[in-house]
Protein backbone atom coordinates (compact mmCIF):
# COMPACT_ATOMS: atom_id res chain seq x y z
CA UNK A 1 0.00 0.00 0.00
CA UNK A 2 1.37 3.42 -0.97
CA UNK A 3 2.45 5.80 1.78
CA UNK A 4 0.17 8.84 2.02
CA UNK A 5 1.80 12.29 2.05
CA UNK A 6 1.10 16.00 1.85
CA UNK A 7 3.36 17.76 -0.67
CA UNK A 8 4.50 21.17 0.59
CA UNK A 9 5.73 23.61 -2.06
CA UNK A 10 7.78 26.17 -0.14
CA UNK A 11 8.98 29.32 -1.89
CA UNK A 12 11.64 30.98 0.26
CA UNK A 13 13.75 34.01 -0.56
CA UNK A 14 16.88 31.89 -1.06
CA UNK A 15 15.51 28.43 -1.89
CA UNK A 16 12.47 26.85 -3.53
CA UNK A 17 11.63 23.41 -2.13
CA UNK A 18 9.25 20.50 -2.62
CA UNK A 19 8.90 18.36 0.50
CA UNK A 20 6.63 15.36 1.04
CA UNK A 21 5.48 14.85 4.65
CA UNK A 22 3.65 11.84 6.09
CA UNK A 23 0.91 11.79 8.74
CA UNK A 24 3.44 11.65 11.58
CA UNK A 25 5.22 14.78 10.34
CA UNK A 26 8.19 12.80 8.99
CA UNK A 27 9.80 13.97 5.75
CA UNK A 28 9.55 11.25 3.10
CA UNK A 29 11.19 13.11 0.21
CA UNK A 30 12.71 16.52 -0.35
CA UNK A 31 14.34 18.58 -3.07
CA UNK A 32 15.64 22.13 -3.10
CA UNK A 33 16.92 24.55 -5.69
CA UNK A 34 18.23 28.13 -5.27
CA UNK A 35 15.80 31.02 -5.65
CA UNK A 36 16.79 34.54 -6.67
CA UNK A 37 15.07 37.75 -7.63
CA UNK A 38 15.81 39.54 -10.91
CA UNK A 39 16.96 43.08 -11.60
CA UNK A 40 14.13 45.19 -13.03
CA UNK A 41 14.46 46.47 -16.60
CA UNK A 42 13.37 49.99 -15.56
CA UNK A 43 16.03 50.51 -12.90
CA UNK A 44 19.06 48.38 -12.03
CA UNK A 45 18.62 49.00 -8.28
CA UNK A 46 15.09 47.54 -8.31
CA UNK A 47 14.28 43.88 -7.60
CA UNK A 48 11.43 41.73 -8.90
CA UNK A 49 10.44 38.05 -8.97
CA UNK A 50 9.69 35.97 -12.04
CA UNK A 51 6.60 33.83 -11.37
CA UNK A 52 7.45 31.58 -14.32
CA UNK A 53 10.96 31.02 -12.94
CA UNK A 54 9.58 30.15 -9.48
CA UNK A 55 7.11 27.67 -11.00
CA UNK A 56 9.90 26.13 -13.07
CA UNK A 57 11.96 25.74 -9.88
CA UNK A 58 9.03 23.93 -8.26
CA UNK A 59 8.81 21.70 -11.35
CA UNK A 60 12.55 20.94 -11.11
CA UNK A 61 12.17 20.01 -7.42
CA UNK A 62 9.15 17.77 -8.06
CA UNK A 63 11.01 15.98 -10.84
CA UNK A 64 14.07 15.48 -8.58
CA UNK A 65 11.89 13.48 -6.16
CA UNK A 66 9.63 11.97 -8.81
CA UNK A 67 10.74 8.39 -8.10
CA UNK A 68 9.89 8.79 -4.38
CA UNK A 69 6.60 10.54 -5.16
CA UNK A 70 5.46 7.76 -7.50
CA UNK A 71 5.69 5.42 -4.49
CA UNK A 72 3.38 7.75 -2.54
CA UNK A 73 -0.27 8.71 -2.63
CA UNK A 74 -0.23 12.54 -2.58
CA UNK A 75 -3.34 13.46 -0.58
CA UNK A 76 -2.92 17.21 -0.93
CA UNK A 77 -0.64 20.11 -1.86
CA UNK A 78 0.03 23.18 0.33
CA UNK A 79 1.98 26.28 -0.74
CA UNK A 80 4.01 28.45 1.67
CA UNK A 81 5.92 31.61 0.77
CA UNK A 82 7.48 34.73 2.30
CA UNK A 83 4.96 37.50 2.97
CA UNK A 84 3.89 40.83 1.42
CA UNK A 85 4.82 40.30 -2.26
CA UNK A 86 2.27 39.85 -5.03
CA UNK A 87 1.04 41.25 -8.34
CA UNK A 88 -1.90 42.72 -10.24
CA UNK A 89 -3.42 40.23 -12.68
CA UNK A 90 -6.06 40.21 -15.43
CA UNK A 91 -9.11 37.90 -15.64
CA UNK A 92 -6.93 35.04 -16.91
CA UNK A 93 -4.46 35.48 -14.04
CA UNK A 94 -1.74 36.95 -16.28
CA UNK A 95 0.56 39.43 -14.56
CA UNK A 96 -0.03 43.07 -15.53
CA UNK A 97 3.23 44.13 -13.85
CA UNK A 98 6.14 42.09 -12.39
CA UNK A 99 6.11 40.98 -8.74
CA UNK A 100 7.94 43.72 -6.82
CA UNK A 101 10.35 42.01 -4.39
CA UNK A 102 10.39 42.74 -0.66
CA UNK A 103 14.04 43.80 -1.08
CA UNK A 104 13.24 46.45 -3.72
CA UNK A 105 13.98 50.00 -2.50
CA UNK A 106 11.37 51.72 -4.71
CA UNK A 107 8.68 51.65 -2.01
CA UNK A 108 10.78 53.30 0.75
CA UNK A 109 9.71 56.79 -0.36
CA UNK A 110 6.04 55.73 -0.26
CA UNK A 111 6.45 54.64 3.37
CA UNK A 112 8.23 57.88 4.26
CA UNK A 113 5.35 59.91 2.81
CA UNK A 114 2.39 57.77 3.92
CA UNK A 115 1.37 60.39 6.51
CA UNK A 116 -0.17 62.49 3.72
CA UNK A 117 -2.75 59.71 3.27
CA UNK A 118 -3.11 58.20 6.76
CA UNK A 119 -1.07 58.50 9.97
CA UNK A 120 1.50 55.74 10.47
CA UNK A 121 0.28 55.30 14.05
CA UNK A 122 -3.34 54.82 12.91
CA UNK A 123 -2.17 52.43 10.20
CA UNK A 124 -0.47 50.16 12.72
CA UNK A 125 -3.33 50.43 15.24
CA UNK A 126 -5.75 49.11 12.58
CA UNK A 127 -3.55 46.63 10.70
CA UNK A 128 -1.09 45.57 13.41
CA UNK A 129 1.72 45.55 10.86
CA UNK A 130 4.77 47.73 11.53
CA UNK A 131 6.24 50.34 9.20
CA UNK A 132 8.42 48.22 6.91
CA UNK A 133 9.15 49.59 3.43
CA UNK A 134 8.33 46.23 1.80
CA UNK A 135 4.69 46.20 3.00
CA UNK A 136 2.09 45.34 0.35
CA UNK A 137 0.23 48.60 0.95
CA UNK A 138 3.26 50.64 -0.18
CA UNK A 139 3.59 48.52 -3.33
CA UNK A 140 -0.04 49.17 -4.28
CA UNK A 141 0.27 52.90 -3.55
CA UNK A 142 3.44 52.95 -5.71
CA UNK A 143 1.58 51.19 -8.55
CA UNK A 144 -1.38 53.58 -8.17
CA UNK A 145 0.91 56.62 -8.39
CA UNK A 146 3.16 55.31 -11.16
CA UNK A 147 0.87 53.03 -13.20
CA UNK A 148 -2.72 54.11 -12.37
CA UNK A 149 -4.09 52.50 -15.53
CA UNK A 150 -2.99 49.07 -14.28
CA UNK A 151 -5.12 49.34 -11.14
CA UNK A 152 -8.12 50.22 -13.29
CA UNK A 153 -7.48 47.29 -15.67
CA UNK A 154 -6.66 44.75 -12.97
CA UNK A 155 -9.06 41.94 -12.19
CA UNK A 156 -7.30 41.17 -8.90
CA UNK A 157 -4.27 41.54 -6.66
CA UNK A 158 -2.86 38.11 -5.82
CA UNK A 159 -0.25 37.55 -3.13
CA UNK A 160 2.62 35.33 -4.23
CA UNK A 161 1.17 32.19 -2.60
CA UNK A 162 -2.14 32.88 -4.35
CA UNK A 163 -0.38 33.47 -7.68
CA UNK A 164 1.10 29.97 -7.33
CA UNK A 165 -2.25 28.53 -6.18
CA UNK A 166 -3.97 30.15 -9.18
CA UNK A 167 -1.48 28.48 -11.54
CA UNK A 168 -2.18 25.16 -9.81
CA UNK A 169 -5.99 25.38 -9.64
CA UNK A 170 -7.24 28.28 -11.78
CA UNK A 171 -8.91 29.75 -8.65
CA UNK A 172 -8.59 33.39 -7.53
CA UNK A 173 -8.17 33.47 -3.74
CA UNK A 174 -6.44 35.38 -0.95
CA UNK A 175 -4.61 33.38 1.74
CA UNK A 176 -5.63 35.04 5.01
CA UNK A 177 -2.13 34.59 6.48
CA UNK A 178 -0.65 36.52 3.54
CA UNK A 179 -3.25 39.28 3.82
CA UNK A 180 -2.21 39.56 7.47
CA UNK A 181 1.24 40.78 6.36
CA UNK A 182 -0.11 43.41 3.96
CA UNK A 183 -0.81 46.36 6.30
CA UNK A 184 -4.26 46.57 4.69
CA UNK A 185 -6.34 44.43 7.06
CA UNK A 186 -8.37 45.46 10.04
CA UNK A 187 -6.67 42.82 12.13
CA UNK A 188 -9.45 42.67 14.74
CA UNK A 189 -12.09 42.09 12.02
CA UNK A 190 -9.90 39.65 10.04
CA UNK A 191 -10.85 41.46 6.82
CA UNK A 192 -9.58 44.30 4.64
CA UNK A 193 -9.92 47.69 6.33
CA UNK A 194 -12.35 50.09 4.61
CA UNK A 195 -10.57 52.96 6.39
CA UNK A 196 -7.09 52.05 5.07
CA UNK A 197 -8.33 51.26 1.55
CA UNK A 198 -10.38 54.47 1.37
CA UNK A 199 -7.51 56.65 2.64
CA UNK A 200 -5.06 55.18 0.10
CA UNK A 201 -7.49 54.85 -2.81
CA UNK A 202 -7.05 51.07 -3.19
CA UNK A 203 -10.31 49.42 -4.39
CA UNK A 204 -11.64 46.49 -2.29
CA UNK A 205 -12.70 44.68 -5.48
CA UNK A 206 -9.02 43.81 -6.14
CA UNK A 207 -8.93 41.21 -3.36
CA UNK A 208 -10.58 37.83 -4.10
CA UNK A 209 -12.23 35.67 -1.45
CA UNK A 210 -10.26 35.17 1.73
CA UNK A 211 -9.42 31.55 2.50
CA UNK A 212 -8.45 30.27 5.93
CA UNK A 213 -5.46 27.97 6.40
CA UNK A 214 -6.59 24.39 5.86
CA UNK A 215 -9.41 25.37 3.50
CA UNK A 216 -9.47 23.68 0.08
CA UNK A 217 -8.78 26.14 -2.76
CA UNK A 218 -9.35 23.76 -5.67
CA UNK A 219 -7.69 20.81 -7.37
CA UNK A 220 -4.55 20.45 -9.47
CA UNK A 221 -5.38 21.22 -13.10
CA UNK A 222 -4.01 19.51 -16.23
CA UNK A 223 -1.36 22.06 -17.26
CA UNK A 224 0.08 22.43 -13.73
CA UNK A 225 0.02 18.65 -13.21
CA UNK A 226 1.95 18.14 -16.45
CA UNK A 227 4.50 20.80 -15.49
CA UNK A 228 5.09 19.31 -12.01
CA UNK A 229 4.87 15.70 -13.17
CA UNK A 230 2.03 14.97 -10.72
CA UNK A 231 -1.41 13.37 -11.10
CA UNK A 232 -4.34 15.63 -12.00
CA UNK A 233 -6.97 16.36 -9.35
CA UNK A 234 -4.88 16.52 -6.16
CA UNK A 235 -6.62 18.86 -3.64
CA UNK A 236 -4.76 22.15 -3.11
CA UNK A 237 -5.09 23.36 0.50
CA UNK A 238 -4.55 26.96 1.64
CA UNK A 239 -1.43 27.68 3.69
CA UNK A 240 0.38 30.96 2.91
CA UNK A 241 2.83 32.99 4.99
CA UNK A 242 5.77 30.90 6.22
CA UNK A 243 6.07 32.57 9.66
CA UNK A 244 2.63 31.46 10.85
CA UNK A 245 3.25 27.85 9.86
CA UNK A 246 6.70 27.89 11.46
CA UNK A 247 5.07 28.89 14.77
CA UNK A 248 2.48 26.12 14.54
CA UNK A 249 4.97 23.58 13.19
CA UNK A 250 7.39 24.29 16.06
CA UNK A 251 4.73 23.06 18.47
CA UNK A 252 3.99 26.51 19.94
CA UNK A 253 0.90 26.58 22.15
CA UNK A 254 -1.20 29.66 22.84
CA UNK A 255 0.70 32.25 24.96
CA UNK A 256 3.99 30.35 24.50
CA UNK A 257 6.46 32.83 22.99
CA UNK A 258 8.76 31.60 20.23
CA UNK A 259 12.18 33.09 19.52
CA UNK A 260 13.64 32.47 16.08
CA UNK A 261 17.32 33.22 16.61
CA UNK A 262 19.60 34.00 13.70
CA UNK A 263 21.26 37.11 12.24
CA UNK A 264 18.07 38.76 13.48
CA UNK A 265 16.04 37.54 16.42
CA UNK A 266 12.28 37.47 15.87
CA UNK A 267 10.12 37.06 18.97
CA UNK A 268 6.47 36.14 18.39
CA UNK A 269 3.57 34.64 20.28
CA UNK A 270 0.17 33.12 19.47
CA UNK A 271 -2.19 35.19 21.62
CA UNK A 272 -5.97 35.54 21.86
CA UNK A 273 -5.72 39.28 22.53
CA UNK A 274 -3.55 42.08 21.19
CA UNK A 275 -3.42 45.77 22.02
CA UNK A 276 -2.48 47.17 18.62
CA UNK A 277 -2.56 50.76 19.92
CA UNK A 278 0.65 49.98 21.87
CA UNK A 279 2.55 48.61 18.87
CA UNK A 280 3.68 51.89 17.32
CA UNK A 281 5.46 52.80 20.58
CA UNK A 282 7.97 50.01 19.97
CA UNK A 283 10.35 50.12 17.00
CA UNK A 284 10.48 46.83 15.13
CA UNK A 285 7.10 45.67 16.43
CA UNK A 286 4.42 44.09 14.27
CA UNK A 287 1.33 41.92 14.52
CA UNK A 288 0.11 39.39 11.96
CA UNK A 289 -2.85 37.03 11.90
CA UNK A 290 -2.25 33.55 13.28
CA UNK A 291 -2.87 30.50 11.12
CA UNK A 292 -5.97 29.87 13.25
CA UNK A 293 -8.97 32.20 13.47
CA UNK A 294 -9.25 34.04 16.79
CA UNK A 295 -5.49 34.20 17.41
CA UNK A 296 -2.92 36.90 16.65
CA UNK A 297 0.87 36.87 16.24
CA UNK A 298 2.33 40.03 17.79
CA UNK A 299 6.09 40.17 17.56
CA UNK A 300 9.28 42.18 17.45
CA UNK A 301 12.64 41.83 15.78
CA UNK A 302 16.17 43.10 16.36
CA UNK A 303 19.73 42.44 15.17
CA UNK A 304 21.22 39.56 17.19
CA UNK A 305 23.79 37.11 15.75
CA UNK A 306 24.65 39.91 13.32
CA UNK A 307 26.16 41.68 16.36
CA UNK A 308 28.02 38.52 17.43
CA UNK A 309 29.40 38.07 13.91
CA UNK A 310 30.74 41.65 14.07
CA UNK A 311 32.37 40.96 17.48
CA UNK A 312 33.96 37.76 16.14
CA UNK A 313 35.42 39.60 13.16
CA UNK A 314 36.69 42.39 15.43
CA UNK A 315 38.55 40.23 18.00
CA UNK A 316 39.05 36.91 16.20
CA UNK A 317 38.49 36.27 12.48
CA UNK A 318 35.33 35.72 10.45
CA UNK A 319 36.34 32.03 10.18
CA UNK A 320 37.12 31.37 13.87
CA UNK A 321 34.94 28.48 15.13
CA UNK A 322 32.18 29.77 17.43
CA UNK A 323 33.13 27.17 20.03
CA UNK A 324 36.42 29.00 20.66
CA UNK A 325 34.53 32.22 21.50
CA UNK A 326 32.06 30.32 23.66
CA UNK A 327 34.81 28.59 25.67
CA UNK A 328 36.60 31.91 26.33
CA UNK A 329 33.34 33.56 27.45
CA UNK A 330 32.40 30.55 29.61
CA UNK A 331 35.50 31.15 31.78
CA UNK A 332 34.18 34.61 32.73
CA UNK A 333 31.65 35.02 35.54
CA UNK A 334 28.12 36.28 34.83
CA UNK A 335 28.21 40.07 34.65
CA UNK A 336 31.48 39.95 32.66
CA UNK A 337 33.36 41.68 35.52
CA UNK A 338 31.37 44.88 34.99
CA UNK A 339 31.75 45.06 31.20
CA UNK A 340 28.39 45.88 29.61
CA UNK A 341 27.39 46.22 25.96
CA UNK A 342 24.65 48.28 24.34
CA UNK A 343 23.99 46.06 21.32
CA UNK A 344 21.84 48.24 19.05
CA UNK A 345 24.53 48.81 16.41
CA UNK A 346 22.00 49.92 13.78
CA UNK A 347 20.37 52.94 15.39
CA UNK A 348 21.81 53.79 18.82
CA UNK A 349 24.59 56.39 19.14
CA UNK A 350 25.59 54.90 22.51
CA UNK A 351 26.11 51.38 21.15
CA UNK A 352 29.27 49.66 22.34
CA UNK A 353 30.96 48.63 25.60
CA UNK A 354 31.22 50.27 29.03
CA UNK A 355 33.19 49.26 32.10
CA UNK A 356 36.32 48.24 30.20
CA UNK A 357 39.57 48.00 32.22
CA UNK A 358 43.15 46.93 31.59
CA UNK A 359 42.12 43.43 32.69
CA UNK A 360 39.37 43.13 30.08
CA UNK A 361 39.91 40.34 27.55
CA UNK A 362 38.21 39.61 24.25
CA UNK A 363 36.23 36.93 26.11
CA UNK A 364 34.75 39.73 28.24
CA UNK A 365 33.68 41.61 25.12
CA UNK A 366 31.96 38.53 23.71
CA UNK A 367 30.31 37.60 27.03
CA UNK A 368 29.08 41.20 27.41
CA UNK A 369 27.59 40.99 23.90
CA UNK A 370 25.72 37.77 24.80
CA UNK A 371 24.43 39.36 28.01
CA UNK A 372 23.55 42.64 26.27
CA UNK A 373 21.54 40.84 23.59
CA UNK A 374 19.79 38.81 26.29
CA UNK A 375 18.89 42.01 28.17
CA UNK A 376 17.39 43.27 24.91
CA UNK A 377 15.40 40.03 24.62
CA UNK A 378 14.22 40.45 28.22
CA UNK A 379 12.94 44.00 27.53
CA UNK A 380 11.25 42.89 24.32
CA UNK A 381 9.58 39.91 25.99
CA UNK A 382 8.20 42.22 28.69
CA UNK A 383 6.83 44.53 25.96
CA UNK A 384 5.33 41.57 24.09
CA UNK A 385 3.63 40.33 27.27
CA UNK A 386 2.03 43.75 27.62
CA UNK A 387 0.94 43.91 23.95
CA UNK A 388 -0.38 40.32 23.87
CA UNK A 389 -1.87 40.20 27.40
CA UNK A 390 -0.01 37.05 28.50
CA UNK A 391 2.69 35.96 30.93
CA UNK A 392 5.42 33.67 29.59
CA UNK A 393 6.16 30.53 31.59
CA UNK A 394 8.76 29.25 29.10
CA UNK A 395 10.40 30.28 25.82
CA UNK A 396 10.54 28.07 22.72
CA UNK A 397 13.75 28.60 20.75
CA UNK A 398 14.40 27.74 17.09
CA UNK A 399 17.02 28.75 14.52
CA UNK A 400 20.80 28.77 14.22
CA UNK A 401 21.38 30.87 17.35
CA UNK A 402 19.91 28.06 19.46
CA UNK A 403 23.08 26.01 18.87
CA UNK A 404 24.99 28.36 21.20
CA UNK A 405 24.54 26.52 24.52
CA UNK A 406 26.19 29.28 26.61
CA UNK A 407 23.84 31.91 25.16
CA UNK A 408 20.87 29.59 25.81
CA UNK A 409 21.85 29.27 29.46
CA UNK A 410 22.35 33.02 29.83
CA UNK A 411 18.85 33.51 28.40
CA UNK A 412 17.30 31.01 30.83
CA UNK A 413 19.09 32.66 33.77
CA UNK A 414 18.24 36.26 32.86
CA UNK A 415 14.63 35.57 31.84
CA UNK A 416 14.20 33.24 34.84
CA UNK A 417 12.07 30.81 32.82
CA UNK A 418 12.94 27.50 31.14
CA UNK A 419 14.10 27.52 27.51
CA UNK A 420 12.88 24.77 25.15
CA UNK A 421 15.16 24.29 22.15
CA UNK A 422 13.81 22.59 19.03
CA UNK A 423 16.57 21.46 16.70
CA UNK A 424 14.27 20.51 13.81
CA UNK A 425 14.76 23.16 11.13
CA UNK A 426 11.69 22.27 9.08
CA UNK A 427 9.05 23.99 11.20
CA UNK A 428 7.39 25.88 8.31
CA UNK A 429 7.01 22.73 6.23
CA UNK A 430 5.75 20.76 9.24
CA UNK A 431 3.14 23.42 10.01
CA UNK A 432 1.89 23.63 6.43
CA UNK A 433 1.68 19.83 6.18
CA UNK A 434 -0.38 19.66 9.38
CA UNK A 435 -2.91 22.11 7.94
CA UNK A 436 -2.81 20.07 4.73
CA UNK A 437 -3.74 16.88 6.60
CA UNK A 438 -6.55 18.72 8.35
CA UNK A 439 -7.68 20.22 5.03
CA UNK A 440 -8.04 16.84 3.30
CA UNK A 441 -10.18 15.57 6.18
CA UNK A 442 -7.64 13.26 7.80
CA UNK A 443 -7.99 15.03 11.17
CA UNK A 444 -10.72 17.09 12.82
CA UNK A 445 -8.39 19.99 13.59
CA UNK A 446 -4.80 21.11 12.95
CA UNK A 447 -4.10 20.43 16.66
CA UNK A 448 -5.26 16.84 16.29
CA UNK A 449 -2.87 16.51 13.33
CA UNK A 450 -0.06 18.03 15.41
CA UNK A 451 -0.67 15.56 18.25
CA UNK A 452 0.73 12.83 15.94
CA UNK A 453 4.17 14.49 16.01
CA UNK A 454 6.72 13.50 18.63
CA UNK A 455 8.62 16.70 19.43
CA UNK A 456 12.06 16.42 20.99
CA UNK A 457 13.20 19.47 22.94
CA UNK A 458 16.40 20.26 24.82
CA UNK A 459 15.69 22.16 28.04
CA UNK A 460 17.76 24.90 29.70
CA UNK A 461 16.63 25.79 33.22
CA UNK A 462 17.46 28.96 35.19
CA UNK A 463 20.39 28.28 37.52
CA UNK A 464 23.00 30.02 39.60
CA UNK A 465 25.61 27.28 39.24
CA UNK A 466 28.29 27.48 36.51
CA UNK A 467 26.82 26.76 33.08
CA UNK A 468 25.65 23.17 32.94
CA UNK A 469 23.46 21.83 30.17
CA UNK A 470 20.72 19.33 30.88
CA UNK A 471 19.58 17.54 27.75
CA UNK A 472 16.15 15.94 27.55
Swiss-Prot record:
Its cofactor is a divalent metal cation. Pathway: Carbohydrate degradation; L-fucose degradation; L-lactaldehyde and glycerone phosphate from L-fucose: step 2/3. Its EC number is 2.7.1.51. SUPFAM superfamilies: Actin-like ATPase domain. It catalyses: L-fuculose + ATP = L-fuculose 1-phosphate + ADP + H(+). One of its GO terms (biological process) is L-fucose catabolic process. It comes from the Bacteria. GO terms for molecular function: ATP binding; L-fuculokinase activity. InterPro entries: ATPase_NBD, Carb_kinase_FGGY, Carb_kinase_FGGY_CS, FGGY_C, FGGY_Carb_Kinase, FGGY_N, Fuculokinase. The keyword RNA-binding does not apply. Signal peptide: none annotated. PROSITE patterns: FGGY_KINASES_1, FGGY_KINASES_2. Keywords: ATP-binding, Carbohydrate metabolism, Fucose metabolism, Kinase, Nucleotide-binding, Transferase. Gene3D superfamilies: 3.30.420.40. Belongs to the FGGY kinase family. Catalyzes the phosphorylation of L-fuculose. PANTHER family: SUGAR KINASE, XYLULOSE KINASE. This is L-fuculokinase.
Amino acid sequence: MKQEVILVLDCGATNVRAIAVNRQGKIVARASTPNASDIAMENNTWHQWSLDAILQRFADCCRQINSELTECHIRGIAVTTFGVDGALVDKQGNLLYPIISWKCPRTAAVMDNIERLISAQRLQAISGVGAFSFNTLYKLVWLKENHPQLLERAHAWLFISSLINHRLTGEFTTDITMAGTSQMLDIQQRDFSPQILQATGIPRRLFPRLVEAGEQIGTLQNSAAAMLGLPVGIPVISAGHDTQFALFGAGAEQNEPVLSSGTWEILMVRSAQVDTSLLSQYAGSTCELDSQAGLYNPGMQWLASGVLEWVRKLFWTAETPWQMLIEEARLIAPGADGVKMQCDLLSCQNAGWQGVTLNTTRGHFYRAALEGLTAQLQRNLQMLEKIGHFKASELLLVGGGSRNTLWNQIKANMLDIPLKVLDDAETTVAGAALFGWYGVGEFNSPEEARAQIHYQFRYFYPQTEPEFIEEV
